[in-house]
Amino acid sequence: MSAPSNVELDPGAVRGLVARAGDPKRERWLDQVRRTGACRHPVRLRGVVLRGDEPVYSTAGEPDGALMVRCGNRREACCPSCAHEYRGDMWQLVYAGMAGGRKGVPESVAEHPMVFASLTAPSFGAVHTRRDDGRACRCGTRHAPDDVDLGQALDPTSYDYECAVLWNWHAPALWNRFMVELVRVLAMRAGVSEREWRQRSRVAYAKVAEFQARGLVHFHAIIRLDGAQDRALAPGVTVSADELAAAIAEAAGRTSLVSEAGNGETVELRFGEQLHTRILAGDGGEVCAEQVAAYVAKYSCKASHEQITSRDSDPDRWCERGVPEQLVQMAAAAIGLSQRPGLRGLGGWVHMLGFRGHFVTKSRGYSTNLGTLRADRAAYRAQQDEPDETQDDSMPVLGFWQYLGSGYLNPGDALLAAGVEASLRAAREALLDARRVPL
């Protein structure tokens, strides 16, 4: 495996390439890189595995005396390889909850009332937008899809950046209130009490948060109704998919939250007026499960901006990397708010523009979970290795590990890993192309 040909090599990279080329354990090192999927920032570990009192594995014999494992970062901009694996797991998790018949989810859930809903943030000031009907923006321009002005405030002096950050900060709590309100609306529409509705039915969901160009999160969610005690059963209160969609819209409009602004004032936060619902199952589907799963999985690997990381919460440096001014202003507002009483925690979420929730969340009964998917993958990989039939399987296996560092030891190793990553990516794309060609 050689370094990518279009990269200008510095002396440090050349020295690293030469050293690895002469390394007698080079092939084992490349095998480790492949096993991590050519992770951009692999974690290097030193350790030993014992079966009883007898060592069965040690990193002493590995290249550089270390074992490399994935960094596990879900963000595409940080590690495309780990993001690809996370995206695949998320697709399986989301799809199983819609289609059923896999990952321990009963087939019957596919016939339950199910809606794909998008809940938006409200407006905190006019921004540059691109209209689907071809009309010009309020600034008089018809913006292209990749226009850098999209999402930027038309008048930064009047845009309410503080309220925008507070909305992101409280968005997870607003979602929780929406779920409570949805049950109330469903019970009211069915003519039963909330308690009776919960005894007969249950709401299951999976949602992903998506950052818009204006720096505010939207929620995209699959919302499904099940029986209260068993997700294999239909909800005990009869509800059509259309009725569920209407209840979602009503509940979103009724949901609100009052937030302290830290300066003695309060702000009422709500979802935006734009709300989209599409039927997935029940009385008739408007969009297929595969498309929705791919949509949710794609956004599960996004961040507030590809040039913003959790290690850098200084908006002054963001400008140098081309981060839009809208996001820089929101970060500055988050820093300012974090100095106020009751909002100190905001300082740890500047890189997320105040959003402190997980990008992907689900209810317990919706589907499988990431831990199970990862355990299944680890078991599958273990089965691919040659078993040692001389080992006593009744003896406990213990591992003792020490963290050595993250990333490759030198630029040359990083370049070689980039070449492996390119090869793996090309192989995946070729496989996808082959699947698209009809036989």
Predicted regions: what is each one?
Residues T129-L166:
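A solvent-exposed, charged loop/short amphipathic helix patch at secondary-structure junctions
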Residues G215-A221, T255-G282:
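Acidic/histidine-rich catalytic neighborhood
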Residues I222-G264:
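Helical (often loop-to-helix) elements that flank the catalytic cores of nucleotide-handling enzymes
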Residues P63-M114, L119-A136:
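Long, contiguous juxta-domain segments that are non-catalytic but functionally important
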